[in-house]
Amino acid sequence: MKVTIRINGDVLSAYIPKKDLEEPIISVANEDLWGGSILLRNGWRLALPHLPQEARLPVTVEARRMFGRLDRGAHEKPDRMTRIGEISSSQDAAAMLAENQKMHPWPALTRTAYEDVAACISSGELSGSGLGIINAFERRMEEWIGGGYVVSASSGTAALTVALIALGIQPGDVVLLPSYTWAATALAPLLIGAIPRFVDIDPNSYNISPTALAAAITPDVKAIIVVHMHGISCDMDEIICHAREQGIAVIEDCAQAHGALYKGQHVGLLSDIGCFSMQKSKHLSAGDGGFMVTRDPTLAQKMRDICNFGLPTPKANYRFDEVVRDGYAVFRECEQIGGMFRLQPMSAALVMHQLEHLRQRIAWLQTAMEPLVEESAKIPFFKITRSHVDRTHVWHKIRVGIDYAAVDYFGRSMAEIRRGLRNSLAERGISSTLWTAPILPLQTAFRPYAGVVEWTKSAGHLAIENSFIVFDENYPLIAQEPAKMAELVVKLQQAWDEHFTSLARGK
């Protein structure tokens, strides 16, 4: 039957192949609905794409049939999804931008994923510790990483927090971390009363600088968190050497580095604890979720207990009620500080099948990036982080840098040069973002911990001020259409040539 939708005054009419669906007229004026969905009669759901507030772009509305009663956990099957139409755009450039932002649905789910989640719901195992699906996920993840003990968590932020607690970090202890990273890296120590101290980065890799790290180590430093930014490993040998000399624990934040290797070893296995995120924008996505990995079985058990309120989780040949104190069985007693940091079982089910194809997707992405890296090296004032012979880059994001020599050459500010290049890319359908800017010590929440460093003159600040991220920050690069990746190098060259000519003309 025909469906008519009014979207901010525009009318979209299309057909849903279900004869018993009455013809509804829906008005959508609230921008908060973009990216959400509307549930119709007979179980159809209309999924509305996310739109920028400042632009009227082509809209593709998807209809999905929900199977089962809505009040009993109805689920949808991807093979019954129907694309039902578009509304017109007022600008060709905006239309191209919207078209080029189309990506594979992410996470990339198969029918098996839907069936696994439905089976999880049917099993009734929706919460708790030591559940079968959680154990299966952890064992599968250990195999995929190639060693260690995996402990699941509710998020990457939770994983970092649990790791710090497990390593004995106390209120007032100092934790070193890079100035350029996502806020969660600094929030984790603050959540347990520790003090983050920021360390400058290497402007070529955007990872923490080992030299700056060595200079920042003082007697009150108890832990170091390194972040493998955008999918390439830090210089771990040098970092571990500095830490071990001082007896300092090291945590790897691997939120953007699923599949990344350093000298043949998977990141996360190179330190005391590796922490991973499974938020939607990651290579491995559960919507939200995370996990830790360590080579130390005692540390793994401690983290498992911390994730379960600090309660001892079941061990082999052990029963809670076997412990007797003052004539009473001790069934539940917190043995340490913890919280409810457990991974949701349905999230584990959602992720399990993704591992089967993740290496293949990463390999495709690495192949797609080779010509981009090579050709970008020929563009004046351009730079894209290259991989190293001793590590594997998994390209979570592409950060395009502009050499500061361009400022002197053109006599323009870096902000003007960067803005013009981004506009030129947008005209060719390539979106971009600044992602997290400014660097953390210049953000309001973290200024009290910035110390005496002039961060506006730091390598990290300058590196972020003269660069930007290509494509949508809410999706990993791996979610891009292959055709769009193939076109990217050409469009980057075209955008820069046009912008270069414009800047040169204005000299």
UniProtKB/Swiss-Prot annotation:
CDD domains: AHBA_syn
Record PTM N6-(pyridoxal phosphate)lysine, positions in chain: K282
SUPFAM superfamilies, per database record: NifT/FixU-like, PLP-dependent transferases
Keyword Methyltransferase carried by entry: no
GO biological process: nitrogen fixation; phosphorelay signal transduction system; polysaccharide biosynthetic process
DNA-binding region as annotated in the record: 256-275
Alphabetic keyword roster: DNA-binding, Pyridoxal phosphate, Transcription, Transcription regulation, Two-component regulatory system
GO MF annotation terms: DNA binding; pyridoxal phosphate binding; transaminase activity
Pfam families from the UniProt entry: DegT_DnrJ_EryC1, NifT
InterPro entries with a match to the protein in the record: DegT/StrS_aminotransferase, NifT, NifT/FixU_barrel-like_dom_sf, PyrdxlP-dep_Trfase, PyrdxlP-dep_Trfase_major, PyrdxlP-dep_Trfase_small
Superkingdom assignment: Bacteria
Summary of the function given for this chain in its UniProt record: Involved in the biosynthesis of the rhizopine 3-O-methyl-scyllo-inosamine. May have a regulatory role in controlling the housekeeping genes within the nodule which are involved in the biosynthesis of the rhizopine backbone.
PANTHER family associated with the record: DTDP-4-AMINO-4,6-DIDEOXYGALACTOSE TRANSAMINASE (PTHR30244:SF34), TRANSAMINASE (PTHR30244)
Family label: Belongs to the DegT/DnrJ/EryC1 family.
Protein name per Swiss-Prot or TrEMBL: Protein MosB
Origin species: Rhizobium meliloti (Ensifer meliloti)
Gene: mosB
